[in-house]
From Swiss-Prot:
Keywords, sorted A to Z: Ribonucleoprotein, Ribosomal protein, RNA-binding, rRNA-binding
Name of protein: Small ribosomal subunit protein uS17
Function: One of the primary rRNA binding proteins, it binds specifically to the 5'-end of 16S ribosomal RNA.
One GO MF term attached to the UniProt entry: structural constituent of ribosome
Pfam families in the cross-refs: Ribosomal_S17
Annotated family: Belongs to the universal ribosomal protein uS17 family.
Assembly information from the UniProt record: Part of the 30S ribosomal subunit.
Taxonomic placement: Bacteria, Bacillati, Mycoplasmatota, Mycoplasmoidales, Mycoplasmoidaceae
Keyword flag RNA-binding: yes
């Protein structure tokens, strides 16, 4: 069942909270009438473990859906794909 969870890729835009990061996920959709590519984005609060494995601002991360961890957190960082330079 663990593999049936939603997985998204995004960029960490804030890590100022304890054990929480804000990740911006962009999605590209085609407009139904004009057929133009429309880029939309959404921000998620994700669980970010402290220590060496913690994601920093600018990191490209893979986030996975999980049980509710707080009032706004339902995602956790599954993997850090690329570190910020």
């Amino acid at each position: 069942m663990r593999n049936s969870r939603k997985v998204l890729m995004g960029v960490v835009v804030s890590d100022k909270m304890q054990k929480t990061a804000t990740v911006k996920v962009e999605s590209k959709n085609r407009h139904p009438f004009y057929h133009k590519l429309v880029i939309s984005h959404k921000k998620y609060h994700v669980h970010n473990e402290e220590g060496e494995n913690a994601a920093k601002v600018g990191d490209k991360v893979l986030i996975m859906e999980t049980r509710p961890l707080s009032a706004t957190k339902r995602w956790r960082i599954a993997k850090i794909i690329e570190r910020a330079k």
